[in-house]
């Protein structure tokens, strides 16, 4: 086993498997959240009588399958799942009791708390498991890095022993081996960069260490300038960026998972989704450090001074870690907890006052602007209950705007801070709860009205002035035409008579042909406009026929229908983008690591899929822009659900930004793939170069063989990743099968007809007109020129 540890590649495949399993776990957790959301939606529809119990059973089966997949992934990652329990069995017991009763809102309200409790417990435990898995990955990366720093590799000794042989190897093979070593150590250096980055902002010693880290960078830049080969091509940068593989970040999937997990666990969905979006964005200092370490690894073997600089930087990194451990700033959560504990102790003393009501309610103070009122609330309370309390006591209405934020005052420090779901338990007797309003909204409205009036008056004056100028100019031009003589009329008549009649006929025919084409386009546009007007009128009639009763308002029906449609569109697009990223990731590995060139049809198909996904994102954006004003009008009358729907809309808008970012990164990766393919087509012999292996020392063959056998025995096959790879391979096979089924003629015909590339000839009206002219000409030629 010691020989296996001395292997330089030991631990590197495990790092890659851990990174891939981490992304797979995030994907499976996202699918589990989708199944949970679908089960709750189906239960709501079942209570209203729109669906049957069969669909509820199908949703439960899907949730159970997704739970099993998540459990397998965590168990394969060495995370204990015994404390989670049998969640599908617990859900089954509650659902069986629920489905035996008649579907109604009372039945759902009776059993829904148990179902939500099971789901919330599951999600809380999954969050803990994800945190444990993340810590395990960081500890493993740190241990592997420390092992590489302390123990020299056996393979490197072999390569050093054969120094004379390596001097005859070409530069390209050396560069490829260096890039492979750099790719294996990227994941370790990322964790190292995070440590330095998190500490450099807190202590002065970290700033000095960061200044020391910048010194090797200057030496590395000098080596880069002196050691660059003159025959380096542009595909090196593209290939190195592909080998990094940091473009595909799956921001939309992470934001979706964080939002729904926070929603089901009654946490702040806006902050959770925003935090998920920030987690995938690396800081500039971290990127700078990664680039420095990468360049030092890539070109550090050319100069011994650079090696010493890099080692000094690593030693500084260790000292930075020691500073972060010993620094008192790393223990800042302890005083924060003490600060939070002190107002609770104070509030516990306050709650013993005689003002406390006998029915379990506590007095609090509500404030809006300069008005303050005292009222009693039942603790613990909710944000919606506080909003309704403000509406009841102050007759407040937010109108078409969003409900303002609620602030509470800390009794110990006298500072107002925003009330969140996590801080609802902090509300005690005697707390001041304030509703923050925008300052002087009426002044803004008045300024807007005055601006509009001024613009309207200015535009009216401009229109009147232009009309006067036009009328005055037309009168002057008419007088000039009456006064001026016309001496050239006779000459023009003689010139017109002397022109060639054949040219006139040809010009007339050309004009008729162009008019025929214009008429054809006009007819097509007119038919499209008529069809659009008909659809609009039909929708208006359907809208007029809807009822506006208070109990079953069409606004609520329209809102639910729009939400369902928007959610289905975003979920479908999210799955589509994830599948597209999987395909591009496979192509990236094929091009960057295996040096295999994908087929042109595959590149064209992926390019079309990217364009379609971007078009779907634009459609989703247009849908949101159209529906957002209608949603705001509905929010005026329905205060209870306004915050949830606004958060849902904010999520969709942020998902659009994330999807655009993901598609941009996918498009960037795809462009790099095409660039590498073009360079490989220009230089086909480079990909076929055989690597020159170093000659082993005499008598070391048995040692190498034992090392290989120990490495084979220590292999741990990853069956789940193999199943996932088989699924992805089946998708690729299906795509290739469709590509092989179509030939070039079908593709060209589809593109030619679909893009409306047919030449405009005037349509059937022009053909009919020409036929009539020919018929008349034939009749005149047969019966004589006098025939009509």
UniProtKB/Swiss-Prot annotation:
Residues 140-253, 298-338 are annotated as: Disordered. GO terms for cellular component: cell tip; cellular bud neck; cellular bud tip; cytoplasm; incipient cellular bud site; mating projection tip; polarisome; prospore membrane. InterPro entries: AIP3-like_C, AIP3_C, Aip3p_Bud6_N, SRCIN1. Residues 305-324 have a biased composition (Basic and acidic residues). One of its GO terms (biological process) is astral microtubule organization. Not essential for mitotic growth but is necessary for normal morphogenesis. Involved in the organization and/or function of the actin cytoskeleton. This is Bud site selection protein 6. The gene is BUD6.
């Amino acid at each position: 086993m010691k020989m296996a540890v001395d292997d330089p590649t030991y631990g590197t495949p495990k790092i890659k498997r851990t990174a891939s399993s981490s992304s797979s776990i995030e994907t499976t957790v996202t699918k589990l959240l989708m199944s949970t959301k679908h089960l709750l939606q189906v239960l709501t529809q079942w209570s209203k009588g729109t669906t049957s119990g069969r669909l509820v059973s199908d949703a439960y089966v899907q949730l159970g399958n997704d739970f099993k997949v998540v459990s397998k992934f965590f168990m394969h990652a060495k995370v204990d799942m015994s404390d989670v329990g049998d969640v599908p069995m617990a859900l089954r017991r509650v659902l069986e009791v629920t489905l035996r009763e008649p579907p109604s809102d009372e039945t759902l309200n009776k059993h829904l708390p148990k179902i939500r409790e099971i789901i919330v417990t599951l999600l809380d435990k999954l969050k803990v498991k994800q945190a444990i898995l993340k810590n395990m990955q960081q500890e493993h990366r740190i241990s592997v890095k420390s092992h590489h720093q302390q123990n020299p590799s056996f393979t490197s000794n072999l390569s050093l022993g054969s120094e004379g042989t390596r001097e005859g190897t070409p530069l390209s093979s050396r560069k490829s081996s260096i890039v492979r070593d750099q790719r294996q150590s990227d994941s370790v250096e990322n964790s190292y960069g995070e440590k330095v980055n998190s500490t450099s902002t807190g202590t002065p010693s970290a700033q000095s260490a960061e200044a020391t880290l910048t010194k090797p960078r200057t030496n590395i830049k000098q080596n880069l300038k002196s050691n660059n080969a003159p025959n380096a091509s542009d595909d090196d940068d593209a290939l190195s960026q592909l080998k990094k593989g940091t473009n595909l970040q799956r921001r939309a999937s992470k934001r979706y998972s964080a939002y729904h997990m926070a929603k089901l666990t009654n946490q702040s969905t806006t902050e959770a989704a925003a935090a998920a979006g920030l987690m995938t964005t690396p800081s500039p200092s971290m990127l700078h450090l990664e680039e420095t370490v990468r360049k030092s690894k890539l070109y550090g073997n050319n100069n011994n001074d650079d090696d010493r600089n890099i080692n000094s930087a690593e030693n500084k990194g260790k000292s930075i870690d020691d500073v972060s451990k010993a620094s008192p700033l790393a223990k800042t959560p302890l005083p924060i907890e003490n600060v939070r504990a002190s107002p609770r102790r104070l509030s516990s003393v306050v709650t013993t006052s005689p003002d406390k009501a006998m029915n379990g309610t506590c007095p609090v103070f509500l404030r809006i602007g300069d008005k303050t009122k005292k009222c009693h609330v039942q603790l613990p309370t909710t944000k919606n209950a506080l909003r309704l309390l403000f509406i009841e006591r102050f007759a407040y209405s937010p109108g078409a705007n969003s409900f303002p934020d609620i602030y509470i005052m800390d009794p110990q420090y006298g500072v107002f801070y925003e009330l969140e779901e996590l801080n609802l338990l902090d509300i005690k007797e005697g707390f001041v709860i304030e509703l923050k309003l925008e300052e002087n909204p009426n002044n803004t409205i008045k300024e807007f009205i005055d601006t509009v009036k001024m613009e309207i008056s200015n535009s009216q004056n401009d229109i009147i002035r232009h009309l006067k100028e036009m009328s005055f100019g037309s009168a002057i031009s008419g007088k000039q035409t009456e006064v001026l003589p016309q001496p050239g009329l006779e000459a023009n008549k003689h010139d017109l008579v002397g022109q060639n009649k054949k040219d006139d006929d040809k010009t007339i025919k050309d004009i008729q042909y162009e008019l025929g084409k214009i008429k054809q386009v006009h007819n097509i546009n007119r038919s499209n406009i008529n069809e659009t007007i008909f659809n609009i009128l039909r929708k208006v009639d359907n809208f007029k026929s809807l009822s506006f009763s208070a109990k079953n308002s069409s606004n609520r029906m329209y809102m639910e229908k729009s939400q369902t449609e928007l959610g289905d569109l975003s979920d479908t697009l999210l799955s589509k983008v994830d599948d597209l990223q999987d395909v591009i990731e496979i192509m990236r590995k094929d091009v960057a690591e295996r040096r295999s060139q994908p087929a042109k049809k595959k590149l064209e198909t992926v390019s079309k899929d990217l364009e379609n996904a971007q078009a779907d994102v634009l459609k989703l954006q247009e849908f949101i822009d159209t529906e957002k004003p209608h949603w705001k009008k509905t929010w005026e009358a329905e205060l209870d659900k306004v915050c949830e729907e606004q958060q849902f809309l904010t999520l969709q808008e942020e998902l659009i930004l994330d999807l655009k970012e993901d598609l941009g990164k996918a498009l960037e990766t795809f462009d790099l793939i095409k660039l590498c393919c073009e360079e490989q087509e220009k230089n086909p012999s480079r990909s076929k170069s055989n690597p020159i292996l170093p000659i082993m020392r005499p008598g070391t063959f048995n040692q190498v063989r034992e090392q290989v056998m120990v490495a084979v025995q220590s292999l741990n096959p990853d069956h789940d990743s193999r199943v996932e790879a088989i699924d992805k391979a089946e998708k690729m096979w299906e795509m290739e099968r469709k590509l092989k089924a179509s030939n070039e003629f079908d593709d060209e015909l589809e593109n030619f007809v679909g893009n409306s590339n047919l030449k405009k000839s005037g349509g059937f009206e022009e053909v009919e007109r020409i036929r009539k002219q020919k018929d008349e000409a034939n009749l005149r030629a047969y019966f004589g020129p006098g025939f009509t």
